[in-house]
């Protein structure tokens, strides 16, 4: 259908539209008109992706000079594929309506691991190995040697792409990862470099967060993207953690021991080259005097190690004299390494700021701040000069150089914590240095400054006003949308007591209480008897899940549960979890029914949708607070309090509730889907917790369902499931939660749509 969204003609590839989709597009258009940033919370399963794509594509076509590109960031590869398929549908609809092929290019970009087609590289399992092997086949000096001696290993796909792929742009169309690989095989071109080259002239690029937020990768991949682009971060409820991880470095004793080995290898290589080809080192010295910008204007294939920080002015300066020659630089790194090793010999926890660390460094081993800032770039230049092919081996030293560059660049927003042992094993000496970023806005600031509109969107962003604070930006629109339903298909409830009236909670004091554990077991047992097909249960941590399940086993509860449904458990091993998921789905398909026990913040809670019968009930055992004794977390809470005036308790509750909402939101993946959302902890009923749930869940959480016993909860569930078992046809939805074009244009409907969005 063709829609008029505030004067913009939007092609929408379906015959019917949800009212909230129309409302969402309106808010989106206002954001683009204002050339500002937006925070939008849209219920899960209501067609967020297609609304985003339809509106932004229409905007691109109406104002081609205002918005030149859409950069769509998603978290996992399956999500990226989903976005590309929606885009394909949309483009087909455009072409059908206009009767001609459009000069439109949309493509997905992922790591070499997902795109490489070289027969020697594809069997490798880990991304780091794939990148290293690829580099050893495509580095500029490897290719130069190949020109003289064709028997040397090389990558024919990259050679072919380099020779012919750049002149011929990708034909218009939509390409997912498999399409790129198929094209690569047909033409003999490397799909990874083809995709990286093509994102410059694509209309839509879909890739993972790290390509924009991790400065080491963004510098290589996203540097050339135009300012007049719209950036969308989908499923962005965790975006602050992604920012923080991309800027943090952990150094263990093992890493430092391997650095030692790396330095010795480099020392030998430098001596060997000095004897055979001293000119090469002299050339490098000359380049470094001219400035790093020249040194790093090398080939794209060598840029495997990027700069971990953002300031470009470092690259314009000449490298300090003390680290220009290779030997001096290696000596410099050795002194730095010795100092960090010495700092790890601690008996108690040390916490200090980067300036304090630097002053200690200057006093002990006379290393000044300025040369440290050049460490990462200088190492990159050295590895290039020495023609090191297997870069994966040098990752420990690269990590140390990244740490040096970061610690000397940022004076605030970071903290250094040195722990002599892991809290869980206090008897084993296992020292670790955390260089921890506490300010999420550091990594995302360049994105907000560079692109004219950035949209942060997800199903669980409540409370909305905390995101602009912790990411330090000023949105022009902030809105949360309700879910218009012809039948109420979600049933949230809070179970706060067992049948014996014992309050149930996962808080630390009552965690080991046998009565609480028994009541949790009874809840799962009774729910497994009334809920059809699949139940997903989330615990607050792996440790808590293991101890609870062990107690259930001793009490004989597990045996009773297994009479009703089969049990599957998520573990920390990715492969095991995948098998458990597969079998869980099989049991649901066969009608045997299954229960999946998993963990909030784990793999299952983040990226897996339990559509229809795969998730008829989600039970959240306890409030998923993060481990509050962690020193890194304490430092971050202190920083948030001082910098952004966010109280510690507010942030912890916000963090726990966004994860709880993320877990229970897995059950509802569309309006024809239905499911129970059981919050099993008396603390959920408090105003500060309940008020932080997304609006679309809060609306259906009635006062009657606030502090139920297990039996009362089961009665509510039975009643709800009986309602849901009645036949439900598309006709029942029409006019209410599904609108045709005529219905959408009626005044009454437009008035109703006004109320869906709640601006903040």
Curated annotation (Swiss-Prot):
GO annotations of cellular component type: CAK-ERCC2 complex; cytoplasm; cytosol; MMXD complex; nucleoplasm; nucleus; spindle; transcription factor TFIID complex
UniProt domain Helicase ATP-binding: residue ranges: 7-283
**GO MF:** 4 iron, 4 sulfur cluster binding; 5'-3' DNA helicase activity; ATP binding; ATP hydrolysis activity; damaged DNA binding; DNA helicase activity; metal ion binding; protein-macromolecule adaptor activity
Location of the region described as Mediates interaction with MMS19 in the Swiss-Prot/TrEMBL record:
438-637
Q: How is it modified after translation?
A: ISGylated.
Residues reported to bind [4Fe-4S] cluster: 116, 134, 155, 190
Instruction: Write the Enzyme Commission number(s) for this entry.
Output: 5.6.2.3
Result, substituting residue 485 to P: In XP-D; the corresponding mutation in fission yeast causes complete loss of activity
Give the activity regulation note.
Interaction with GTF2H2 (p44) results in stimulation of the 5'-3' helicase activity of this subunit. DNA unwinding by this subunit in TFIIH is stimulated 4-fold by XPA and 20-fold by ERCC5/XPG.
- List the SUPFAM superfamilies hit by this protein, alphabetically: P-loop containing nucleoside triphosphate hydrolases
A single GO BP: erythrocyte maturation
Q: Which family does it belong to?
A: Belongs to the helicase family. RAD3/XPD subfamily.
As for what it does, the entry says: ATP-dependent 5'-3' DNA helicase. Component of the general transcription and DNA repair factor IIH (TFIIH) core complex, not absolutely essential for minimal transcription in vitro. Required for transcription-coupled nucleotide excision repair (NER) of damaged DNA; recognizes damaged bases. Sequestered in chromatin on UV-damaged DNA. When complexed to CDK-activating kinase (CAK), involved in transcription by RNA polymerase II. In NER, TFIIH acts by opening DNA around the lesion to allow the excision of the damaged oligonucleotide and its replacement by a new DNA fragment.
PANTHER family per the record?
DNA REPAIR DEAD HELICASE RAD3/XP-D SUBFAMILY MEMBER (PTHR11472), GENERAL TRANSCRIPTION AND DNA REPAIR FACTOR IIH HELICASE SUBUNIT XPD (PTHR11472:SF1)
NCBIfam families recorded for this chain? rad3
Name this polypeptide is given: General transcription and DNA repair factor IIH helicase subunit XPD
Instruction: Tell me the classification of the organism that encodes this protein.
Output: Eukaryota, Metazoa, Chordata, Craniata, Vertebrata
Give me the gene this protein comes from.
ERCC2
């Amino acid at each position: 259908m063709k829609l008029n969204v505030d004067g913009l003609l939007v092609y929408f590839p379906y015959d019917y539209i949800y009212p909230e989709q129309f409302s969402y597009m309106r808010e989106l258009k206002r954001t683009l008109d204002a050339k500002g940033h937006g925070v939008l919370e849209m219920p899960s399963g209501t067609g967020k992706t297609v609304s985003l794509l339809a509106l932004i594509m229409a905007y691109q076509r109406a104002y081609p000079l205002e918005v030149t590109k859409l950069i769509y960031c998603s978290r996992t590869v399956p999500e990226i594929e989903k976005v590309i398929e929606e885009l394909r549908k949309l483009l087909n609809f455009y072409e059908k309506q206009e009767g001609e092929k459009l000069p439109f290019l949309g493509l997905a970009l992922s790591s070499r691991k997902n795109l490489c087609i070289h027969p020697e590289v594809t069997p490798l399992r880990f991304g780091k190995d794939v990148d290293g092997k690829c580099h050893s086949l495509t580095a500029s000096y490897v290719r130069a040697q190949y020109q003289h001696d064709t028997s040397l290993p090389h990558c024919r796909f990259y050679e072919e792409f380099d020779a012919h792929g750049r002149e011929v742009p990708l034909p218009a169309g939509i390409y997912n990862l498999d399409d790129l690989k198929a094209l690569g095989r047909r033409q003999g071109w490397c799909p990874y470099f083809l995709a990286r080259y093509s994102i410059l002239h694509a209309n839509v690029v879909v890739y993972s967060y790290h390509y924009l937020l991790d400065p080491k990768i963004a510098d290589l991949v996203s540097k050339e993207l135009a300012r007049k682009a719209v950036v969308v971060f989908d499923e962005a409820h965790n975006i602050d953690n992604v920012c923080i991880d991309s800027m943090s470095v952990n150094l263990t004793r093992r890493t430092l021991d391997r650095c030692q080995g790396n330095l010795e290898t480099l020392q030998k290589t430098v001596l060997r080259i000095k004897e055979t080809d001293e000119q090469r080192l002299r050339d490098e010295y000359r380049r470094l005097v001219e400035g790093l910008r020249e040194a790093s204007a090398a080939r794209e294939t060598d840029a495997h190690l990027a700069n971990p920080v953002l300031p470009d002015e470092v690259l314009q300066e000449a490298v300090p004299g003390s680290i220009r020659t290779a030997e001096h630089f290696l000596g410099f790194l050795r002194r730095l390494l010795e100092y960090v090793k010495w700092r790890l010999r601690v008996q108690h926890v040390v916490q200090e700021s980067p300036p304090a660390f630097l002053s200690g460094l200057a006093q002990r081993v006379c290393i000044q701040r300025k040369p440290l800032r050049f460490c990462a770039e200088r190492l990159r230049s050295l590895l290039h000069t020495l023609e090191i092919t297997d870069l994966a081996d040098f990752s420990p030293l690269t990590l140390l150089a990244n740490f040096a560059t970061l610690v000397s660049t940022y004076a605030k927003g970071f903290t250094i914590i040195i722990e002599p042992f892991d809290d869980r094993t206090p008897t084993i000496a296992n020292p670790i240095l955390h260089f921890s970023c506490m300010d999420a806005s550091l990594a995302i600031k360049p994105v907000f400054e560079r692109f004219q509109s950035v949209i942060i969107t997800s199903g669980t962003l409540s409370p909305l006003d905390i995101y602009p604070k912790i990411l330090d930006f000023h949105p022009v629109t902030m809105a949360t949308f309700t879910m218009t339903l012809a039948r109420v298909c979600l049933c949230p409830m809070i179970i706060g007591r067992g049948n014996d009236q014992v309050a149930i909670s996962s808080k630390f004091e009552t965690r080991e209480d046998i009565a609480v554990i028994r009541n949790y077991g009874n809840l799962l047992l009774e729910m497994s008897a009334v809920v059809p097909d699949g139940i997903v249960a989330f615990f607050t941590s792996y440790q808590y899940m293991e101890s609870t399940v062990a107690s259930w086993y001793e009490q004989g509860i597990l045996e009773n549960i297994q009479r009703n449904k089969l049990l599957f458990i998520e573990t920390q091993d990715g492969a095991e979890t995948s098998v458990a998921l597969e079998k869980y789905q099989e049991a649901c398909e066969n009608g045997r029914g299954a229960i999946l026990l998993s963990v909030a913040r784990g793999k299952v809670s983040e990226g897996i949708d339990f559509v229809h019968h795969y998730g008829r009930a989600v039970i959240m055992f306890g409030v998923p607070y993060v481990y509050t004794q962690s020193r890194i977390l304490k430092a971050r809470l202190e920083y948030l309090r001082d910098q952004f005036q966010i109280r510690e308790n507010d942030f912890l509750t916000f963090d726990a509730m966004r994860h709880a909402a993320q877990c229970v939101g897995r059950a509802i993946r569309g309006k024809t889907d239905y499911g129970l959302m059981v919050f099993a902890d008396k603390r959920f009923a408090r105003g500060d917790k309940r008020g932080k749930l997304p609006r679309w869940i809060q609306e259906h959480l009635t006062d009657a369902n606030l502090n139920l016993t297990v039996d009362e909860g089961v009665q509510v569930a039975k009643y709800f499931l009986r309602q849901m078992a009645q036949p439900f046809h598309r006709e029942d939805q029409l006019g209410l939660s599904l609108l045709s074009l005529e219905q959408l244009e009626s005044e009454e409907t437009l008035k109703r749509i006004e109320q869906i969005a709640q601006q903040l």
